[in-house]
């Protein structure tokens, strides 16, 4: 893919003029030729950069995976956290990368319409024959901070979401998040584990959500991903099937509409949990424990009831709090 640089710059500057106009700061001659000044190296990056994947957390924070000439990059937009990983190195000059990101992603200016107006309206090719483009630093100052990190190794679809989760988990420590340090540590450890089948994309999105229920449901989906393990593994052994258990479960669901029972499967999975963790779950969810209480069953019932209260609304599930 070769990106049209004229079209990319037109998109970026057009977004800025629209932003100002919608807030009663119309830029004179909004269709005039304007672009971001760049050097030949930046032009080459803008032409060939490919946005492989991205995630947006509102209008001001975004994560992106870029590929440029078979080299892989991770970009953060609007993040306070600076990636601290030996596998990634911060690029000092991100010209070309920045225009690509601002063209491809729905990033909103982080300054006032008046500031956008003052920068964009200052010049154009139509008003000044000596115009050579807007200064890159001036245009970038209108948006949240962009950082680009080059990866020491190629990135794949399987790797990018754990990478994004690691970054978003660390970002949650910087302030304004309800996530405490211990939970952030657990999320970072989960990212490093890079477990097949876990919904890392959903986990990543929920880490910066202001509602804790979002993260609970994402973690619940992680547990759901293992529900078929017990039955599918038994079938694999009994029939001497060579395929992985999750492939067997997929075939069973597609061909026979079979899926594991949710509540009982949750208890089976929780049987592998540490006793201290199960006791902590019960304590958090106000479960009264007796000496003979089956911990996995008690924790499973409480988790499932909480899940139902979040997902459904029924009088029997409603609470006064």
Name what the model sees in each region.
Residues 2-211, 225:
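Charged, non-catalytic interaction/linker regions at domain boundaries
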Residues 178-321:
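Amphipathic, oligomerization/interface secondary-structure segments
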